[in-house]
Amino acid sequence: MEFTDQALAHCPDIDEKRVGICGGSYGGFMCNWMIGHTDRYGAAVSQRSISNYATKCLYTDIGYYANRLQMEAYPWEDFHKVWSMSPLSGAVNAKTPTLFLQSDEDYRCWMGDAIQMFSAVKRQGTDAKLVLFHGENHELSRSGKPENRMTRLKELEEWFEKYLKKN
């Protein structure tokens, strides 16, 4: 978020009300985190993301040790620490319209995390949309089926146009 502050300070031509964020994998995690901690962005697109470290540590192809390395704790050792580092914990504050793009065969960032974050944001009354890609995995944007890659880009473009385009 500090980067956005610096960019806006150095580039006065940027309309700060029409800045969007987008990220996939760790970038999706960061996107989820930011929408729960600031309302500065006009729209967000979260792709193949992580939202809940308490459950992620039990079902990722990275391995059972991943949470321990990232957070120095498993949920059963220090639930508060793990939960406080999970984007889902901040979803109650989400005000940014967010599109969630997720593959149903992604075993790194499972579909459940996208559904949890989408559901939590939607329940806050914030506009959100979830698009699931059947038969795709973590590599959708790079090596997915051409029709799904095109759909992904179309969804992303339409979301940003809806919320960021000048009338």
Which residues does each predicted region cover?
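Active-site-proximal cap/loop segments of hydrolase catalytic domains
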Residues: 1-167
